[in-house]
Amino acid sequence: MTAHAHAGAQLTRAPFLLAVVVLAVNDHVLKAWCPSWWTGKLSDAAGMVFFPLLLQGVWELALETLGRWQGTSRRVTAVCVALTGAVFCLVKTNVHAARWYQATWGLLRWPLDVVAAWWRHQPVPRVGVVQLVMDPSDLMVLPLLGLALWTGWRVSREATQAPQPAPAWAVR
């Protein structure tokens, strides 16, 4: 086993961490500073790497907590990537799927909104909906799912490889 052969290892890899930074900077700085079509595309692009790896990491950590995790699976990676792609396609092209997505994420985000309101000494907010722009041209970022797939598969491959002995120069 390698150093990354643990549940959620893909959450420690550069593509995931870079996607987190891009999402944070884009959504909290760039969209406020200079909102345009490209800030939306940038969020979508980072999301194609972020969401499947997050989904896989949460799945693996849940299995590990239950004592049922048996290692990173290429199949789980593929399912998480496919699920992310399918949901993204639906919410960008289907009005009913988009409304469901907005309401569901608004409901899931509400507890965080309550904590934020409490922290700021504000009244409890109503359950809201998240913003979503239905734009079929956003589908152009789908090829970036390949980076998430590659990252997950690489973690899986490394987890099954035998540990490499230290080089002779490092043992001295």
For each feature predicted by the language model, list its residue ranges:
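Alpha-helical transmembrane segments
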Residues: 11-24, 82-83
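Juxtamembrane "helix-exit" motif on the non-cytosolic side of transmembrane helices
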Residues: 25-35, 90-99
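Membrane-interface junctions at the ends of membrane-embedded or membrane-associated helices
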Residues: 58-71, 153-162
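Hydrophobic alpha-helical transmembrane segments
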Residues: 117-147
